[in-house]
Swiss-Prot record:
The reaction(s) this protein catalyses: a (3R)-hydroxyacyl-[ACP] = a (2E)-enoyl-[ACP] + H2O
The protein's name: 3-hydroxyacyl-[acyl-carrier-protein] dehydratase FabZ
Similarity annotation: Belongs to the thioester dehydratase family. FabZ subfamily.
GO CC annotations, alphabetized: cytoplasm; membrane
Gene coding for it: fabZ
GO biological process, one term: lipid A biosynthetic process
Organism: Colwellia psychrerythraea (strain 34H / ATCC BAA-681) (Vibrio psychroerythus)
UniProt xrefs under HAMAP family: FabZ
């Protein structure tokens, strides 16, 4: 039996997280299971503003922005796992542990962002995230987020 995918388009993403260009780093959600997992993508292009300085001779997508893309994916999963986003609230990136960068992400790459909900305790949500390019892990980390008013 084939499972039905649950995509989320860019318009809905923008109702769930407050980020906008150039800091909106999730292009679309391929699939998600509320309370469990989310698979999203970020298409990295040479037109990203960051590439004018990182680095002019060899454009490499910054690791901190890969982590930010994973954090945005956790916010989307968080809101899709609960009653949704209320007025003037968001998930704040609270901490990161065990971050590893294994390969550079270059213009033209499609990053597949995979996040998994691990647990919630006292309003803090813990996730495991991986960014993959061509099926290979380029970054992994444990991320903590907190749902808070703006």
């Amino acid at each position: 039996m084939e499972t039905v995918k649950k995509p989320i388009d860019l318009n809905e993403i923008k109702t769930l997280i407050p980020h906008r260009y150039p800091m909106l780093l999730v292009d679309k959600v391929i699939d998600h299971e509320p309370g469990k997992t989310l698979h999203a993508i970020k298409n990295v292009t040479i037109n990203e503003p960051v590439f004018t300085g990182h680095f002019p001779e060899l454009a490499i997508f910054p690791g901190v922005l890969i982590l930010e893309a994973l954090a945005q994916a956790t916010g989307i999963l968080g809101f899709k796992s609960t009653e949704g986003r209320g007025d003037n609230e968001m998930y704040l990136f609270a901490s990161i542990d065990k971050a590893k960068f294994k390969k550079p992400v270059l213009p033209g790459d499609t990053m597949h962002l995979h996040v998994e909900f691990l647990k919630e305790r006292r309003g803090m949500w813990k996730f495991y995230g991986e960014a993959r390019v061509d099926g290979k892990v380029v970054c992994s980390a444990d991320l903590m987020c907190a749902r808070r008013p703006l």
